[in-house]
Amino acid sequence: MSSAKTFTKHISFDDLAPSLIDDQATIIKNDSHHVGLNNHFLHIPPQFNPVYKNTLTGSHGSNDLATDESLDSPEDEEASSPLQLGTPTSTTSGVPHFYTQVFSPAAHDPSKSYLRSPSVERSRSESPMFRSRRRTSVRLPPPPKVSVLKKSRKAADEQGPIDDIDIGDLDFELERKMTKMTERNTQKNSGSRKGYTQAAFANLNEVEDRIETKSMVDLSESENMESSKKRSKSFAGMTDEELAKLEEFYISKGRSNKTKIDQFDFGEQVPVYLNTTESKTDSSNVTDPLAAIYPSRPTIVHNAISMTIDHPDYENYISNTKEKLNCKDKDDDVDLRVVSCYISGRRYTWSSVDWYVENLTRNGDHLVIITTIPEFEAKIDTLAYKEKRRHRLERMTSNTSESMTTASHSLIGPDLSSPLSTGIRIEAIHNEAKQTCSDILNYYARRLATKIVRISIEMVKENSTRSAIISATSLYRPSLQVISTVSANIQIKFRNGKVKLPFFLMKHFAMPAFVVPFEFIKPELLIKPRVDKDEQDNSDDLKTEVRKKERLQWLSALIRRTLENPFTKHKVVDSDDEESDSDESVTSVNEYFPISPEKKEEMEFFDKMGYVRPKPSRQVLLDDNTLMKYDSSGRKLTPIESRNSRRSSKRSSRIQFNNNGIYKVKSMVDDIYNHETASTPHIKTALKWDNEDPKMKFTSHPMRKTKSAGLSPRTSSTSSSSGQRKAHHHHHHHNHVSRTKTTESTKSGNSKKDSSSSSTNDHQFKRSEKKKKSKFGSIFKKVFG
């Protein structure tokens, strides 16, 4: 374990609002606003800005400018010092604040134009024309103390020293040195990074090259003229021998069914090259294949803030590890493993980074924290438009005197709906975003102080979370990703057609994904770990690690508490009489005080699963009064409010049940019985109903039961018992019908069963007729009575 060291800044990019300065300059130009000397967005050179305070001399820029110009002209020595109307007034914070601001009414007042006139520093004893001509020679700002430029004594086009080599007396070492020097110069002139090629010298346009090209062109033209002067010989002037040779030549070139290999002239064939020739019209063909080829469009197309900090030993650890592993520079990957985690303003999303810090981190990792920020420029513009419209409506509805008072107040204070105020809002959000990224980096740097890792945060300006994660993933190419969820049931689809983010990442990204439920991490230990009383004063919450022993004790206590049956509180009785008496007393008490459906559901769950369902960690967190809980609007939450709130999730993501409590009819239940057990209605199959309640015979799922609200407990219990007897009798009747159908299908029925089945059919027909007759009357009673 390496000692904790301070992380160092690596590389940071800020592209969250790149067009802020240009937009503000365009607004000032189009609206003809006054450009003050201390404009917040435009940089005025210090030689023209009297607000600029020179750090070297400790005086203002206007005094320095007047002093330098007084040395050039003897006229200025007799002149009085310029009128200091533009001296800055220091505020309570010590920051110079020039009173000719953009929002000040004096900036737009024509009667006070002298405040922004460039002649405030001009002396009365000299000509304004001469002074303005002298001002064209500007003075540069003071140079830095340490120059970043390398000093070189030779000129830019001056050649370096050349070693003289006597080629008359060459030995092996000298020849080898000359060969290396020639190759190095050729590679430098070719423009290639690795190796060299002569293709870069094909487009030279020197004098000797032009002369040589012209001579080659003249030679080719003369050859073409000579060949054109030669005319082909006619057949009339040929001899018989020439005609015979010409005939043989045509026969060898033509197509014939009777070709002879001895008559084929191989010397007249077009040469065939086996290597592939590149097309000259191919646009991808470059002069130097080893030269650097840059993409025609940018790789990073999203606006974001990217900050990175490294452990001081990170680079050395990576290089040493790669040397041990014999890694080849195929992909030019600097990091050994890149892990990405997504966080947002929702608290449960931070469980992904917390789980990585506690369980997955190792030396050489590159942790990339991805977060998003919406398109705040458009939202600020919409907000400014609404404020401007509201002020306009208030001005129209108010009286004349009130409108004059409002107009006078608007001149004194800045207009929040103006474009300049909008730019200040955008810059404030930008600065707050940078500060938030810095705080997140410092927080996890303190938690990972003992690990040699690199931490990066990428805040993408995007309204869509999916697009932001896609852009950041294509940029960093992580080896694995950790995502958190509030529910373990991630394969669900919402009413608006969207799916959960973990399911989207697991389905569409070709990389390992760790899905961390928020309830599996105890929030109390992550917020503030337990420490001893002696160490409480000298310990820090961020540096204190959660002890493994405390975690195991908490899990053991949870398992022990959930395995105890809280519903068996009566004592075990030895004799049968006492047991029967206790059962009768329990049943009598249950008749007067029936068990609630929630309690009965808990008892059935314990009989089925064998343990008590534990509370979710969110509920435990809300039940703890020592912690402060707030909602999105900043209001403090209580356990009752959090359970009744619309945004709170009432489902338990830890346990999934198959018990849905649906209604089932007889047609859905008949398949459970087999023909062997149909004759014994009270005996259940050993495969299905060994451990179930005898009252529930049709399905393994509990039936929904309705109870009249107007009855007393004793009446309701009596009616329920009579209902059970009727249901029991009806159950015997249906079993008898099923046995009748079975005997009819096997053709082994008797007359007694046939008579019972016929009577049953008649009884069912009468009931259906009676139901049809009473249907209209029941509807009439429901509507009118």
Swiss-Prot record:
Region (Disordered): 53-162, 571-590, 631-657, 693-785
Protein source organism: Saccharomyces cerevisiae (strain ATCC 204508 / S288c) (Baker's yeast)
Protein name, as recorded: Uncharacterized protein YGR237C
Compositionally skewed regions (Acidic residues) per UniProt: 66-79, 575-584
Note: Present with 1050 molecules/cell in log phase SD medium.
Keywords carried by this UniProt record: Phosphoprotein
UniProt feature, compositional bias: Polar residues: 53-65, 81-94
Listed Low complexity bias regions: 776-785
Phosphoserine: residues bearing it: S215, S667
Gene Ontology CC: one annotated term: cytoplasm
Biased composition (Basic residues): 725-739
The keyword Nucleotide-binding is assigned to this record: no
Keyword Membrane: no
